[in-house]
Amino acid sequence: MPAPLTLDGFRADLAEFLYQQPDEVDLEENPLYAGLDSLRIVTLIERWRETGADVSFIELAECTSFDQWWQLLSARQGGAGHVTA
């Protein structure tokens, strides 16, 4: 069973695609305004599915902040994603 996605891992994944440090990722920022295009979002979705978070592109596209993404992802892991380590 894959390790669940953590908030730290989520921030690190976003930072990689945004060319930032994980602590620079603003979770209140709109993903589309942050510069994530559809290809990058699909790549992230595939990565997160490997951790057990089953979300779709449409579900993420309806969210208006990275924090909403995190809430959806962590809920899809049965709450296991609330770990920060």
Curated annotation (Swiss-Prot):
Residue intervals of the Carrier domain: 1-77
Keywords in alphabetical order: Fatty acid metabolism, Lipid metabolism, Phosphopantetheine, Phosphoprotein
Residue ranges crossing the lipid bilayer per the database entry: none
Residue numbers carrying O-(pantetheine 4'-phosphoryl)serine: S38
Required cofactor(s): pantetheine 4'-phosphate
InterPro entries attached to this UniProt entry: ACP-like_sf (IPR036736), PP-bd_ACP (IPR009081)
Source taxon at top rank: Bacteria
GO annotation (BP), single: fatty acid metabolic process
Pathway stated in the Swiss-Prot or TrEMBL entry: Lipid metabolism; fatty acid metabolism
Functional summary from the UniProt entry: Acyl-carrier protein (ACP) involved in the biosynthesis of a unique class of isonitrile lipopeptides (INLPs). Is the dedicated ACP for the loading of activated acyl groups catalyzed by ScoC.
Family note: Belongs to the acyl carrier protein (ACP) family.
Protein name in UniProt: Acyl carrier protein ScoB
Species, as recorded: Streptomyces coeruleorubidus
Gene, per the UniProt record: scoB
